[in-house]
Amino acid sequence: MRVLGIETSCDETGIAIFDDQHGILAHQLYSQIKLHADYGGVVPELASRDHIRKTLPLIEAAMQQAGCRSEDLDGIAYTAGPGLVGALLVGATIARSLAMAWNKPAIPVHHMEGHLLAPMLEERVPEFPFIALLVSGGHTLLVRVDGIGHYQILGESVDDAAGEAFDKTAKLLGLDYPGGSALSKLAEQGTAGRFVFPRPMTDRPGLDFSFSGLKTFAANTIRSQGSDDQTRADIAHAFQTAVVDTLAIKCKRALQATGLKRLVIAGGVSANKELRSQLAELMHKLGGEVFYPRPEFCTDNGAMIAFAGMQRLKAGHTTGLEIVVQPRWNLETLAPVTF
């Protein structure tokens, strides 16, 4: 079976074709970073317009890359949410139109389920059950995963997502958009221990997160300590260490509470080297394993949507003619997949 995947939830246009026997046959990605850089963040209207321009050409490129014709496809998967409503509608409309024209089923995919399943595109595939840390610009979730569609949210951010906090703090430090990766690079030049940031919500029981206070703490530190190059690097180092420590502490709590020994990390922030290093060390101490996608599949992409769509297609989870998106969509409401 082959599935075309379409990802347009935010500021990346991702297209891929996944074959259940041969894996990823094609992968095309266009990033809108330059488009939004002058604004310091994603402008929804501009994002939607750019998806309109890029989606069909990227689909054509993916079909050529895979040597695939419409009759070779078994379904068309698209991100139906969560995300920016206009951007989601572009992908959903194109996917639904192609499905109708080619007489193929359309498969709506939850964006975070795509991220959650992305490590299954690698050679080392996690077995169920496991704990998943989904950490991106829009979400920070700790999820118990007993199977595809069998999700229990154990903890989530009560305010800013971790990736959002990275980007906002990077902006305070005068770094270009998107700031998360730039902040991590700057942190490499920082001096450990000069500044110590709090580890939010780790002084109480529970698995929820809060990162908005770290941005405020960073702003106050910049205001009081100045913004010379070394100070900025030291602040970046302290901020990143606080976020990574907080994520690791909550992961450890979730693993100990459930007794599970497998941890999956996914989403854009899962590409962070310090986070990967600390969670690898944690799982080594706990006698467990950690799994994550290759860096190109940490950020939004069509491959994860094609793969998740394949699982849903096999379970018969397709839609009719309606074009429906869900800008807000609780992961726990997804139907379980049984083959």
UniProtKB/Swiss-Prot annotation:
Family affiliation:
Belongs to the KAE1 / TsaD family.
Identify the InterPro entries for this entry.
ATPase_NBD, Gcp-like_dom, KAE1/TsaD, Peptidase_M22_CS, TsaD
Main EC class of this protein?
A: transferase
Catalytic activity entry = L-threonylcarbamoyladenylate + adenosine(37) in tRNA = N(6)-L-threonylcarbamoyladenosine(37) in tRNA + AMP + H(+)
Record-level GO cellular component terms? cytoplasm
Keywords of this protein's UniProt record, alphabetized?
A: Acyltransferase, Cytoplasm, Iron, Metal-binding, Transferase, tRNA processing
Name of protein: tRNA N6-adenosine threonylcarbamoyltransferase
The entry marks the following residues as binding substrate, namely: L134, V135, S136, G137, G138, D167, G180, N272
Q: In the Enzyme Commission scheme, what number(s) does this protein have?
A: 2.3.1.234
Domain of life of the organism encoding this protein: Bacteria
For Fe cation, which residues are the binding ones?
A: H111, H115, D300
UniProt keyword Iron present: yes
Which cofactors is this protein said to need?
A: Fe(2+)
Gene Ontology biological-process entries:
tRNA threonylcarbamoyladenosine modification
Cofactor info, note text: Binds 1 Fe(2+) ion per subunit.
Q: Where in the cell is it found?
A: Cytoplasm
Q: PROSITE patterns this protein is in? A: GLYCOPROTEASE
The function of this protein is: Required for the formation of a threonylcarbamoyl group on adenosine at position 37 (t(6)A37) in tRNAs that read codons beginning with adenine. Is involved in the transfer of the threonylcarbamoyl moiety of threonylcarbamoyl-AMP (TC-AMP) to the N6 group of A37, together with TsaE and TsaB. TsaD likely plays a direct catalytic role in this reaction.
State whether keyword Transferase applies: yes
Q: Which HAMAP family match?
A: TsaD
Question: GO MF terms on file?
Answer: iron ion binding; N(6)-L-threonylcarbamoyladenine synthase activity
